[in-house]
Amino acid sequence: MTKYVLALDQGTTSSRAILFSREGDIIQISQKEFTQIYPQPGWVEHNANEIFDTESWGMRDCLKQAGIDGSQVVAAGITNQRETTVVWDKASGAPVYNAIVWQDRRTAGFCDELKARGLADTFRQKTGLVLDAYFSGTKVRWILENVPGARAKAEKGELLFGTIDTWLIWNLTKGKVHATDESNASRTLLFNINTGQWDDELLGILGVPRSMLPTVTRSSEVVGEIHPEFLGKAIPIAGNAGDQQAATYGNACLKPGMAKNTYGTGCFMLMNTGKEVHASKNNLLTTMAWATPSGRYFALEGSVFIAGAVVQWLRDGLGIIKDAPEVEQLALSVPDNGGVYLVPAFAGLGAPHWDQYARGTMVGITRGSTKAHIARAALESIALQTLDIMDCMQKDAGIKLAALRADGGATRNNLLMQFQADVLGVPVERPKVTETTALGAAYLAGLAVGFWKSEEEIEAMWQLDRRFEPNMSAETREKLVYDWQRAVERAKAWAQE
């Protein structure tokens, strides 16, 4: 009987379940979108129950479509949108408020207060993160301060907190296991990456009771079992990593100095820095990559908030394309951007600027500008934001990148991949399996149960689909980068009164 590993890939806009073979091939994908909730400008929420319902539907549908039963699944791995925060009642399992999504900016003012109190360095040294509304800690505090009765219940030990992985594990195990892994814990502003523990000083500053926190486990170990009622058999939950760390693992960036960029809703570049903590001097994040039996691994990370989401905006906001793949043909209908630059700072700017008051800006528009120029500028903005991060990463790590491995939905766009190689000046490698986030979760789970024997075996399975070589003149590149930087300066601090 053929055996498989199941990956549960819980993303920002959809929940997916993907079944992988021993060769690392995709056997089946099931996917369901869920509701995006925007209560007011800058606020983004999800219904936590809907997240679990779509994910549990996905895993059942995945096995059904593949024509296999639970007895053929040796392990499940979880990967998730990071930082998104759920607080729920320990007794009933009911969320006390909607999940507050990583994109949500409601705690920006509180982050400013913490900076004004001189606490930025404390958080940076302990967590590797910057004080920004992006991370979970200030979101937990907001729920405790603003949901009636939540603070009192939390102080009595009646509420639990978790990122999405923790929420899924809690529900899949029917409330038996309250756990997260080091990669997810390292995104909360509550976890000390140097000690590998929750940090009492940080918990005190943010007013989060320790009793709310999940147990922190390795990214590759059996933490519990999916209850038999879901798939007809108890299946070990053996892998867990935040989406970007999982993608780094799935792209086999297992040696220090290797880097990948994931092109999804946002854009996320991670460089494996091995077992050393590299503090960034260029406004990148230092984060946990993963913790496996071979040790604790760290990464430098640059986060772009809006990448693929800018294409959704062209479709839903401006109506200039009917579906996302159309953007490539539209952008190819003009030879260049016609001097138009789009800075998609719809939710502020992430690394390396960390400007929560920046807003979306389009510059260089003339009477001759068309929707094709705007489409091209939108695609180019994804690659140019990535360039800003790579420059900082190379300075921090003291390593010149040899190539960038790319994954995520937007890597199917050949124009974007070629432009990315051109502006970076290094080759961009697209793997055969671009579902590397789910693959990473599957690898971590499979390793824990012996389905795969070693990381060397995983490295050998990585296969190249296409390598994009840079072929832009230095003069053209310099002009593009110079104008892009001017456009970014105009977007900064726009919403600051």
Swiss-Prot record:
Pathway: Polyol metabolism; glycerol degradation via glycerol kinase pathway; sn-glycerol 3-phosphate from glycerol: step 1/1
Enzyme class: transferase
Residues the record lists as binding glycerol: R82, E83, Y134, D243, Q244
Reactions listed under catalytic activity: glycerol + ATP = sn-glycerol 3-phosphate + ADP + H(+)
Residues annotated to bind sn-glycerol 3-phosphate: T12, R82, E83, Y134, D243
Entry's Gene Ontology BP terms: glycerol catabolic process; glycerol metabolic process; glycerol-3-phosphate metabolic process
Listed transmembrane segments: none
Function as written in the Swiss-Prot or TrEMBL entry: Key enzyme in the regulation of glycerol uptake and metabolism. Catalyzes the phosphorylation of glycerol to yield sn-glycerol 3-phosphate.
PANTHER family the record matches: GLYCEROL KINASE, SUGAR KINASE
Protein name: Glycerol kinase
Lineage: Bacteria, Pseudomonadati, Thermodesulfobacteriota, Desulfovibrionia, Desulfovibrionales
